[in-house]
């Protein structure tokens, strides 16, 4: 079943390549089949927000990826919630 989720990632997650890491990993998941769309961005409070839409299994894989993060990151916690599906989302991108 298709879902759309917002993930807020807290800890040392800015200035460590977190957004590029997420984009790279989503692109790898999407190589086999187009499974995820959405975006990733830094927030002013030092956290990172990921909006992702796709099948539940792909979202679960993404959550595990977010828990690990890139080598220089230190993920302290992740908040997630389901939000309304946006049928206009086609790609996954980094927002500045």
Swiss-Prot record:
Gene label: acyP
EC code(s) of this entry: 3.6.1.7
UniProt xrefs under InterPro entries: Acylphosphatase, Acylphosphatase-like_dom, Acylphosphatase-like_dom_sf, Acylphosphatase_CS
Domain Acylphosphatase-like: 4-96
Catalytic activity: an acyl phosphate + H2O = a carboxylate + phosphate + H(+)
Annotated GO MF terms: acylphosphatase activity
Biological classification of the source: Bacteria, Pseudomonadati, Campylobacterota, Epsilonproteobacteria, Campylobacterales
Alphabetical UniProt keywords: Hydrolase
Transmembrane segments: none
First-tier enzyme category under EC: hydrolase
Catalytic machinery residues: 19, 42
Species of provenance: Helicobacter hepaticus (strain ATCC 51449 / 3B1)
Name of this chain's protein: Acylphosphatase
Protein family membership: Belongs to the acylphosphatase family.
